[in-house]
C-alpha cells in the first residue's frame, strides 16, 4: 500500500525513465529541420563525420541525438518511414542495454535501426538476433537500403551458409541472423585448427528481437554440437516392447509399476515396477536371471528402460513431435514450429524412433555446448525488444542484468479483452468456440484462433470442416504457407487456426496485406506505367473497402482455446489484435479438462462450479476465476524460473571451465611457438611421475626405482639407469636424479626437432595440443553431464547438491588438465618422426575431420538414475569386474598410483 502511494507521488521507475528519454527526443526533433535541408550526399556523409569523432574519443552517448536524427531522416527519404517519438525512445532504451517492451505493430524492426546505426559507428560490429532464418533475411532485406544509403554494410548469417559467406556476413557493420546460428558459430570458432578459419569478431553489441522467446523460453535448452558415438541401436528396438508390459499408476502412491509426474515431466518406477521390469527384461533375454537393474554393469540397461518409458508416457505424437518422411521431427513447445535437425539427448530420440517404428539413428556424443544464457552474457552490451516482457522483468534483471522499460503505444490501445469462459468439459468448450466463430464469420469479422498444439489445431479444423466454415490452418505442418496465411488473416470473415507460432514477426493488417500484390504489379514489365498506376489504385480502393468493413465488424477477434503455462504467451496471442490503435477483441475459452487447469487449478475452479450448480453447456465468467487461473500460471512461471535459475547455477560451473579451455585453446592457435608449452608440460608430467614412484621426504625403502624405469621406458621411451645411479651415489639428493631424467627427455626431444626441422615440429605439436584439448573437453562434458544427472541424490545424504557438483566438477577438471599434459607428452615423446613429410602426415592424422550434428537440445538438471557417455571411471572398473589395489598403477594409464588418481573418485 505504501509502495502504491509513493508510486503515485513520485511516479514509477518506468515513468521517470520515459521522462528522461522524452527530453532527448526533444533534442532529436530540434535537429530535424536542419537535416531536411541537406542533400542526399551531405546526409550520407554524416556517417564518416561521426566515425571520425568516435575515433578521436567522443562517446556514442554524446553522438546519440545527432545519429538518431540522421537515421530518421535517411529512413524517411529511402523507405518512406519516419520514426515516431515512441520509436526514438525504444531506440534509446536499446542503446542503453535494456529491454524495450513495445506492443505488436509498433514497428520494432524499424526501431532496431537506430541503435544499430549508432553502435556500428564504433566499427566493432552489431548483431541483430531474430528467431528464424525467414525473419533474419526479411529484416536485413528491408533495412539494407537504409544502411547502405548511410554507408554501412549489412550481412545475413543463415544456417547452411558456406564458410566464406559467413566470414563476409560477420565482417559487415551490421549482421542479421538467428540466435542458434550465432551460438553455433561461437562454438565452431572454438573448434578450429587455424585462426583464419574463424568467422566471428569479438562479441560487442547484440539486439535480440523477441527477446522473451530467446532468453526465457529457450534458456533451458542448450546449443549442442555433437558427433556419432558408439551405440547399440538394436537395444532401443528391443526395449520398446517393455513399457507395454508395465502398468501406469493413477496416483503417486497407488497400485502400478510407474508414476508419471506431469508437473515435473518425469517418470518414476515404483519398487513393484523395478521387479516387474527386471522380470520382463529377463524374459526378453536382456538381463541375466538373478541380476539386478541397480548393479553397475546394468547402468546402460537402466538408461534404455527409462528412455523407453519417457518416450511412451511423456512424449506424444502431433504434440511434442511429428513423423515426417520417416523421421521424428521435434515441435517447439513455445512456437509450435518444426525443429528439423534437432534431436533429444540421453537416448530419448532413439526411444521415440523405436516407438514410432521409423529408422533409428545412432546416439551422438557432445563435442561442444553452451546455453543461450551464457552465450548472450559474452556480449559487452546486450539489448532486447519484444511485445511481452513485463511479466518476466524480474528474471531478465536477475539472470541477465537487463532492465525492462515499457514503451507507450503511438496510438491508444482500444482492444477489448473479455474475461475467460470456463466450461466443465472440452466438448462444451469447443461447442462455444464454434458458436463464436460462426457469429464472427457471418458478421464479416476476421478471427484468429490460437491453440497450444498441432493436435488441437487439427481437431478444431475438423470441427470447422464439419460445420462448413471455410478456414486456414497455420501449424508446424503448414510452416511453408505461414507468411501467405498471415497476410490474408485480416480479410473480412476469414477464420485462421494457429498454434503458438501465430506468425510472430508478421503483422496482421485489417482488410488483408496488399503489399505483395503491389510489388508484383510494379515488377511486371509487360505493363505500362499508366496500367500499373490504375491497377494499384484499384487494389488500394478494394483494400480500403475491406478495411472499413473489418473496422465496422469490430476488428480482428482473438480466440484462445486454452491458457498456456505462461501468461506472456497468452499476451502474445492477444497482441496479434489491436495494432496501431485498431479496434479488436479477445477471449479465452477453457475447460476443466485443459492441462493447466487439470494439473494446477481444477479443484478450486471445480468447487466454484459445483457451488454455483452449473448446468451443462453453461460457463463461468468471473474475475475470480480468471484470477485463479492467472495464479496457477504464476505458479508454473515461478517453477520454470527456478528450473532456469538452477540450470544456470549448474551451467556456470561448466561455463567457467569452458572459458579457461577456450582461452588456452586460442593461445595455442595464436602463439607463434608452442615448444615452451610442450616443454613445461613434459617437465611437469615427468616431475609428478618421479614424485609418485620416488616420494619426496621419504626413505629408500619407499622408493620404487624399477617401477619408475618401466613406466618411463614403456610410456615415454626414456631409458635411464636409475637403479645404477642410486647405487653409485647413495648420498645424492632425489632432485639430482629427477633433473637428469628431465635433461634426458629434453635431449631426445631436441634430436627429433633436429631431424624434422623446427617449423614442421611446431605445426605437429600445435595439432597434437588442439586435438587432445578437444578430445579431453569432449569427454569432460560427458563426465559433467553424468555427474549432474545423479547429483540431486546427494541431498538424501544431507549434502548440498550444488556445492557437491562444484567440488567434484573441479576435481574432474583438474584430472582432465593432468590427462591433457600426460597424453600430449606421451605422443610427442613416442612418435617416430624422421622427416618433415612424416610430421605433416602425422599432423593431418591428428586433424582428421569428423561428422557433426547441431542440436538445440533438452537440458535437464535432474535426470534419470543413470546416463551414458561418461569417460573412464571407478564404476567402469566395477562393471568390468576389475580389482585394483590402492598402491597399484592406475589402469587409466596416468602412471600414478590408483589411490592418487581415479581411486580418489571411487
Swiss-Prot record:
InterPro entries: Helicase_ATP-bd, Helicase_C-like, P-loop_NTPase, SEC_C_motif, SecA, SecA_CS, SecA_DEAD, SecA_motor_DEAD
The organism's place on the tree of life at top rank: Bacteria
Matches recorded under SMART domains: SecA_DEAD, SecA_PP_bind
Cited function: Part of the Sec protein translocase complex. Interacts with the SecYEG preprotein conducting channel. Has a central role in coupling the hydrolysis of ATP to the transfer of proteins into and across the cell membrane, serving both as a receptor for the preprotein-SecB complex and as an ATP-driven molecular motor driving the stepwise translocation of polypeptide chains across the membrane.
Quaternary structure (record): Monomer and homodimer. Part of the essential Sec protein translocation apparatus which comprises SecA, SecYEG and auxiliary proteins SecDF-YajC and YidC.
Family membership: Belongs to the SecA family.
Protein name in UniProt: Protein translocase subunit SecA
Organism: Laribacter hongkongensis (strain HLHK9)
Biological classification of the source: Bacteria, Pseudomonadati, Pseudomonadota, Betaproteobacteria, Neisseriales
Primary gene name: secA
